Regions:
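Generic detector of N-terminal low-structure segments
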Residues: 5-8, 162
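Acidic, Ser/Thr/Pro-rich low-complexity intrinsically disordered segments
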Residues: 25-75, 84, 98, 138-282
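Bacterial N-terminal signal peptides
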Residues: 7-18
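Hydrophobic or amphipathic alpha-helical targeting/insertion segments
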Residues: 90-94, 104-107
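Predominantly extracellular/luminal regions of secreted and cell-surface proteins
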Residues: 105-132
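N-terminal secretory signal peptides that target proteins for export/translocation
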Residues: 1-3
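Solvent-exposed loop/turn motifs of extracellular immunoglobulin-like beta-sandwich domains
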Residues: 85-89
């Protein structure tokens, strides 16, 4: 069921490709923002090449609504509307012209408000001020780091996560959390399940703190999603497979497994042999 819209686009393209071979297929360079909130419409801008009008869009998230607002040669503007009940996590969007489809564009359904990374945030002195509830669309800067700063109250717990694998980025992130004196409170690198960084910190002292995000191999231009919030730090869900049409309790393993709320889910029988995500909170 979830792939029917895309297959219909491919079928149409196969019928028309021979007559349109001189037109380049769409190629995507960037998407801003890279995350969309449930229960809202997000205006998304995609840049690249070969965006000939008319252009079609498709997604593997069957409950998402995509509306093309404007098409230019190197930019497509669209509105992405997600229902309140959408599962949090990555999903794909495809653009298709008469010449063929683009590679999939990975977008995150995220309940944290999206913010774009500011230009020039390459030092503590020029760090970008962000909220403790935010999802930042970022890009690695080679030998330089991206610096952010947050203000916290006494005994506030804040969770941090740099997402790369889910958005199919090749970045290998390293994160440093620092206090006003430059002391490193946390140095986060790979965890047990991959290169993404996830940790939480309980701030005993109120004030301003700084976070640096950089690529471990000093490569520039690699995408990442920097999430700051009050979410649990988890590694996996269990069981990993459920029976469609039956209610199942989903538990979680990881640092905050004892605090994470067990989720009861039931997928329709038509959802058999599909993959999805399950979100939880403390």
């Amino acid at each position: 069921m979830r792939f029917k819209p895309f297959l219909a686009v491919v079928w149409l393209l196969l019928l028309t490709q021979q007559a349109s071979s001189a037109i380049a297929q769409p190629t995507v360079n960037s998407i801003v923002p890279r995350s969309c909130m449930p229960g809202a419409t997000t205006r998304v801008t995609i840049t690249g090449k070969g965006f000939a009008d008319p252009i079609r869009v498709a997604t593997n998230r069957i409950d998402a609504k995509l509306d093309v607002v404007a098409v230019e040669a190197e930019k497509v503007t669209m509105d992405v509307t997600l229902p309140d009940s959408v599962p949090l996590g990555p999903f794909g969007i495809w653009l298709a012209s008469a010449a063929g489809p683009s590679e999939p564009i990975i977008v995150m359904a995220d309940d944290l408000p999206p913010v774009s990374e500011a230009a020039g945030n390459v030092a503590i002195e020029s760090a970008q001020a962000v909220s403790t509830l935010v999802s930042v669309d970022g890009s690695s800067k080679g030998p330089q780091g991206s610096f952010f700063k947050i203000d916290v109250v006494e005994n506030q717990r804040v969770a941090f996560e740099v997402v790369t694998q889910a958005i199919e980025s090749k970045m290998d992130p390293v994160v440093r959390l620092m206090d006003a004196d430059g002391n490193i409170l946390v140095l986060a690198d790979d965890d047990e399940i991959g290169p993404d960084c996830r940790f939480s910190y309980q701030f005993d002292t109120p004030g301003t703190y700084w976070i640096e995000v950089r690529d471990n191999r000093y490569t520039a231009g690699l995408a990442y999603q920097f999430r700051i919030g009050d979410f649990p730090i988890l590694r996996h869900a269990f069981p990993l497979a459920v029976t469609a049409g039956e209610k199942t309790s989903i538990g979680f393993g990881g640092v905050d497994q004892t605090q994470a709320i067990v989720q009861e889910i039931e997928f329709p029988k038509s959802f058999a042999n599909k993959v999805t995500t399950v979100a939880t909170r403390i």
